[in-house]
Amino acid sequence: LTGDDIARMARQPKLCPQFHLSLQSGCDATLTRMRRHYDTAEYMRIVQALRAHFENCALTTDVMVGFPGETDAEFKRSLSFVESLGLAKAHVFAYSRSPGTRAADMTGQLPEAVKEARSARMIEATNRTRAAFLAGQAGRTANVLF
């Protein structure tokens, strides 16, 4: 999404200000291993542009934990980045090995217990940001479709 794309969307009066931007990880090293074509700075630029054009917009995402090679430091970086986003909701899931994929053959496969613990921590964090987002909706008036 470019700034022009976002400005064009903002001119549409019937557009619901809810945006799902798949993140996958809040750590650039992990995103590189995943072969994603963006980094956290670009992601944050899009988030800031959306918030500048859409007051009180709802941002949602997908976050994967436990991707092969993810260190404790990388997980903490991802957790911190996700917390900084103030998301309305996040779908958190642990990496699961799928035969035939590039990631399945990567070194650094993490034990299930580590992936489960990281998933639980990320879910706790995103539940807090969701609660804060929802609390901010109290008393607001919004147009809805039925």
Predicted regions located by residue number:
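Terminal RNA-binding accessory module
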Residues: 105-146
